[in-house]
């Protein structure tokens, strides 16, 4: 609930989503945009002076049943569409955005880099703990760099 977030008196709210939305085979960009808009409006109403930062999802795979016992995996093509929708929303609404999808390889390598480094769970969507640690470190480094660029370091 938004009231629970407001009760924390945050200095920054980070909105990180897109993976689950893009895993819906009926992913709808208009619906996703509207949902983000509704959430951001509620946050801004409750926390008018708190900056909001969005992060895009990393790459992930779609799973298909190849036979009764075997599944095959391919890169989820809707992730790139969700990222594009999120970037457009952030731009339209004056939100900062960290594009994790591009930071970890974009359309060509985002999934493959994590899979080859053995940082993904067998579901090919979620990370192992080490993967989440790396995600946090990448975000921290990007945030620190943006701050240093801002203050002129």
Spans of features found by a protein language model:
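Extended hydrophobic-aromatic, low-complexity segments
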Residues: 24-25, 51-55, 63-66, 108-109
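Catalytic His-Asp segment of secreted/periplasmic serine-dependent ester chemistry enzymes
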Residues: 60-153
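Oxyanion-hole/transition-state-stabilizing segment in secreted/luminal serine hydrolases
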Residues: 1-33, 59-60
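Short, functional N-terminal and low-complexity linear motifs
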Residues: 2-10, 49-52, 101-107
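Alpha-helix N-cap/loop-to-helix boundary motif
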Residues: 28-35, 74, 78
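Structural recognition of the beta-strand scaffold that forms the well-ordered cores
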Residues: 12-16, 51-56, 96-100, 126
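Alpha-helical scaffolding within the catalytic cores
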Residues: 1-6, 34-42, 83, 109
